[in-house]
UniProtKB/Swiss-Prot annotation:
Comment block on domains: The J domain is necessary and sufficient to stimulate DnaK ATPase activity. Zinc center 1 plays an important role in the autonomous, DnaK-independent chaperone activity of DnaJ. Zinc center 2 is essential for interaction with DnaK and for DnaJ activity.
Native source species: Rhodopseudomonas palustris (strain BisB18)
UniProt KW keywords: Chaperone, Cytoplasm, DNA replication, Metal-binding, Repeat, Stress response, Zinc, Zinc-finger
Listed cofactors: Zn(2+)
GO cellular component: cytoplasm
Positions with a binding annotation for Zn(2+) 2: C165, C168, C187, C190
Protein name according to UniProt: Chaperone protein DnaJ
Chain residues that bind Zn(2+) 1: C148, C151, C201, C204
A Pfam family recorded for this sequence: DnaJ_CXXCXGXG
Length: 379
């Protein structure tokens, strides 16, 4: 009965003044929410879905909407102005909308050719800090799928060709009417390729590609960092049935270095020096990443942990003429396993020492003395 039907405007959750774009937007939103495929086994969602379709079919048509606004549901009852109808026109418009909803329209461009792009490949390579400093050309061997030479990647035996799929006509997808709406799915006859192979190539079993080891040259530029990615276009997995190949991505990682630590373009190192060298001062010689040596002047009275900068002795900056710096941190080494004579000399040195020779220690103990002296007076 017409009296049991909900108002079409209420069904689409829009005002009576809603324009075409508002109606379409509301329909898309509700159709997506209540589509049976998104609510399997829910009978109420299927019923709601039908109501939404019926309401939209009427309100999107100017003449039907005018009749509905004037007579309500009675306009489409037996003998009225004509029912909403769910013929071929509805199936077409409904299908177009769902192509937008589920992205089907964008997929059509690649159908019917049978070609598929090859997958991208990843290769992890570890290099040394020295390699990153000078750059190098490395040779790598990778297992990769290449186009079958026997069939030129078609998958068909020599002298034959793939045939257009008779089930989908080369589209790769088929449409199936279910009641008042149409669903589109991957063609089961060709698995979406649009072509079938009756006589497969014996060399590749119809795949259109075979597995082989391939040697490639990889150019590693100066200044690469840990995690740098190098792309080799077209060196990935071969495409199917003549499709384009994928790309190969080389991911670089830097091995830890026994002497240097890297921070961007700068290099850091720790150099132990004796207590005497720190006290009297002098020069120390340190290795550099370019296999050379640099001298660092250590002033007298240098404390452990002090850093010295050597300009332009770091790493080159990738794709730049700039170069980082090198930082040398001195670590004053406390003598161990002293002889009796050495202990005597150090004890003598301690007796001769004053606050002037050890200002930080003298200042510290003065603060401690003042602290406890203040607390004693307060108590």
């Amino acid at each position: 009965m017409s009296t049991t039907k909900r108002c079409y405007y209420e069904t689409l959750e829009v005002d009576r003044s809603a324009d075409d774009s508002s109606l379409k937007a509301a329909f898309r939103k509700l159709a997506m929410k209540w589509h049976p495929d998104r609510n399997p086994g829910d009978a109420s969602s299927e019923s709601r879905f039908k109501e939404i379709n019926e309401a939209y079919e009427v309100l999107k048509d100017g003449d039907k909407r005018a009749a509905y606004d004037r007579y309500g549901h009675a306009a489409f009852e037996q003998g009225g102005a004509g029912g909403p109808g769910f013929g071929a026109g509805f199936a077409s418009s409904f299908s177009d909308i769902f192509e937008d909803l589920f992205g089907m329209a964008g997929q059509r461009g690649g159908r019917g050719t049978g070609r598929e792009r090859g997958a991208d490949l990843r290769y992890n390579m570890e290099i040394t800090l020295e390699d990153a400093f000078v750059g190098k050309t490395a040779q790598i061997e990778i297992p990769v799928s290449v186009t079958c030479e026997s069939c030129s990647g078609t998958g068909a035996k020599a002298g034959t060709k793939p045939k257009t799929c008779s089930m989908c006509g080369g589209a790769g997808r088929v449409r199936q009417a279910q009641g008042f709406f149409t669903l589109e799915r991957t063609c089961p006859g060709c698995q979406g390729r649009g072509q079938t192979i009756e006589d497969p190539c014996p060399a590749c079993s119809g795949a259109g590609r075979i597995e082989r080891e391939r040697t490639l040259s990889v150019n590693i530029p100066q200044g690469v960092e840990d995690g740098t990615r190098i792309r080799l276009a077209g060196e990935g997995e071969a495409g199917l049935r003549g499709g384009p190949p994928g790309d190969l991505y080389i991911f670089l990682s830097l091995a830890s270095h026994e002497f240097f630590q890297r921070d961007g373009a700068d290099l850091h190192c720790r150099v132990p020096i004796s207590m005497v060298a720190a006290a009297l001062g002098g020069e120390i010689e340190v290795p550099t990443i370019d296999k050379g040596k640099s001298k660092v002047k250590v002033p007298s009275g240098t404390q452990s942990g002090r850093r010295f900068r050597i300009a332009a002795k770091g790493m080159p900056v990738l794709r730049s003429r700039q170069t980082g710096d090198m930082y040398v941190q001195v670590v004053v080494e406390t003598p161990q396993n002293l002889t009796k004579r050495q202990q005597e000399l150090l004890a003598e040195f301690e007796k001769l020492s004053s606050g002037a020779t050890q200002p930080e220690a003298a200042g510290f103990f003065t603060k401690v003395k003042d602290f406890f002296g203040t607390r004693g007076a307060a108590s």
